[in-house]
Curated annotation (Swiss-Prot):
UniProt family annotation: Belongs to the thiolase-like superfamily. Thiolase family.
PROSITE patterns per record: THIOLASE_1, THIOLASE_2, THIOLASE_3
Matches recorded under Gene3D superfamilies: 3.40.47.10
Protein name: 3-ketoacyl-CoA thiolase
Annotated catalysed reactions: an acyl-CoA + acetyl-CoA = a 3-oxoacyl-CoA + CoA
GO molecular function: acetyl-CoA C-acyltransferase activity
Species, as recorded: Marinobacter nauticus (strain ATCC 700491 / DSM 11845 / VT8) (Marinobacter aquaeolei)
Amino acid sequence: MSLNPRDVVVVDCVRTPMGRAKNGCFRNVRAETLSAALIEALFERNPKLDPKEVEDVIWGCVNQTKEQGFNVARQISLLTRIPHESAAQTVNRLCGSAMSAIHTAAQAIQTGNGDVFLVGGVEHMGHVPMTEGFDHNPAASKYSAKASNMMGLTAEMLAKMHGITREQQDEFGARSHRLAHEATQEGRFKNEIVPIEGHDENGFVKLIEEDETIRPETTAESLGQLRPAFDPKNGTVTAGTSSQLTDGASAMVLMSAERAEALGLTPIAKIRSMAVAGCDPAIMGYGPVPATKKALKRAGLKVEDIDFWELNEAFAGQSLPVLKDLKLLGVMEEKVNLNGGAIALGHPLGCSGARISTTLLNIMQAKGGKLGVSTMCIGLGQGIATVWERI
């Protein structure tokens, strides 16, 4: 493949293991510490990458308060070998924050405003709960349903509109855990996971090397025993078919193709196109459909051209309508979330965009796929998507 000088390439990408938000393995580890460990690991894994080359550290984070406040990207950068002369910014597009960090860096590279960027995201949902400090504007109810702020109810709405049954959701949830467990057992996550020191259930320091969130014993039958979590009387969405609340971080090295060549670094993929789109907040989970269609059009591609997909599993009742309308249900077992998804691994809000992209790129490398798409829904009615091409 011939690369243009300003093509945006990925040199390396990593993530932490995913820890449960409630009394999990990272209950005594801060968000900045998780992120800084990934940046240090990227420098260790890529000795030709000079910290002085970094133009900007761009980090996604949703709830920017407490340890995640006051420009957490800069707080993270100051914990690493990156010099003070390099800049840092925190971005927030709710669930799409880390993917927006990728897009922000990519746009800078494409326009000649920098060559080397460290991007990623973090959310410590154990230390900073999802709605910590949020004050909803009552006037917003004139323009969108108040229930649009309750993600589980938006999933209920989307599932009902598309005729998605409780049984289909339970099957999808069980699939996520089964595939994530298989990926762990077969070592498919090893290249992307950076082991991080945490604590076991007894409080002893332990090197965390695998995701804490996967429940291999999960079946559709066991999920079928759970009560609806958001609409107790008529609902179909349960805690078992929703993304888990977790603590985690993800990180990538993005740079221009010409700078990667000059530094002697071998890129693993390039960005073909990017897109964001909006939708009705009441069905916020539908956002990946318009965003993906827009990104594919910009790349001159069709759905059937894509070898592998990573769709953030906010809810099974949200994922299945998206796959249905993208005409992917028939090829799901061959192409979609082959190592499980957020139902098994969790969805640390500001982290997930780079996490699913990291997992996708590792799948593409392992299986030899040429083209991949990572896409996700975003609270209050948005979607974001990235088209990747393996090098």
